[in-house]
Amino acid sequence: AIGPVDEV
């Protein structure tokens, strides 16, 4: 992922 959030 990219940025402060991550996809599970």
Curated annotation (Swiss-Prot):
Signal peptide: none annotated. GO terms for molecular function: hydroquinone:oxygen oxidoreductase activity. Keywords: Lignin degradation, Oxidoreductase, Secreted. The keyword Secreted applies. GO terms for cellular component: extracellular space. Inhibited by Ca(2+), Fe(2+) and Al(3+). Optimum pH is 2.4. Stable at pH 7.2 and 5.2. The keyword Hydrolase does not apply. Its EC number is 1.10.3.2. Its main location: secreted. Optimum temperature is 20 degrees Celsius. Thermostable, maintains activity from 50 to 60 degrees Celsius. One of its GO terms (biological process) is lignin catabolic process. It catalyses: 4 hydroquinone + O2 = 4 benzosemiquinone + 2 H2O. Belongs to the multicopper oxidase family. Inhibits cell proliferation of HepG2 hepatoma cell line with an IC(50) of 2.6 uM and L1210 mouse leukemia cell line with an IC(50)=3.2 uM respectively. Lignin degradation and detoxification of lignin-derived products. Exhibits broad substrate specificity against a range of aromatic compounds with highest activity against guaiacol. Shows lower activity against 4-methylcatechol, 4-hydroxyindole, catechol, hydroquinone and 2,6-dimethoxy-phenol. This is Laccase. It comes from Sanghuangporus baumii.
